[in-house]
């Protein structure tokens, strides 16, 4: 029974984290209350109605099914989870019906191709009226990955001790990373003579060259950024490499204004259509 109870509670913790990863980022003034409610949801687990091992197994099966669904939805899989609990309640606290507990968690998992290990502490203080919980320490270890853009975000999540932001933002980051990779690969296959990926489809840049315009080159830099609140969004920039003679002949400053025009094009057509339009415009003569 004890082993099954422990497994049920571990599954509940995983489900609570995955549910948070599905939610949109809350407004700053909502964050504190929503975090507290999420921690409370993990522990408000009613065992009074369970009278046999069969009841536990039924509940365990239900939680495993829910965890599988949420893992499929978010792409986040928790492989291992362990917890140690230390009772910090003093005699004075006991007399006031206050309980203070420190939980030390370790878990490992992955979000698609990104593998992570987490070590974090949760301090719980409970009295007759309410239960408050807070992450007091967070250490994130990321396995070597193609996603170099994650390093700054991981440091910020550790500094803020924001476990929920880590899961939520990681989910959306990986979605954008996979979309960028698929888009670069698709354009390379469709326009093999014009598109080059010097660091492969997983990199953040794509080059466009034209055989009919030697020395003229466009480079798309597509970064995936995570802001201070954990919101994930793409940022695309256009860099131009042109011969000096072409710059001198560009009386309408089309080359100079190309980066701004490209951002406008992305806003109007969307990312993939804007990139393809750029390729076609540069390589119009080859296509004809």
From Swiss-Prot:
Gene: CENPP
Pfam annotation, one family: CENP-P
Organism: Homo sapiens (Human)
Glycoprotein is among the record's keywords: no
GO terms for biological process, alphabetical: CENP-A containing chromatin assembly; chromosome segregation
Family: Belongs to the CENP-P/CTF19 family.
Record's subcellular location: Nucleus; Chromosome, Centromere
Official protein name in the record: Centromere protein P
Keywords (A to Z) from UniProt: Centromere, Chromosome, Coiled coil, Nucleus, Phosphoprotein
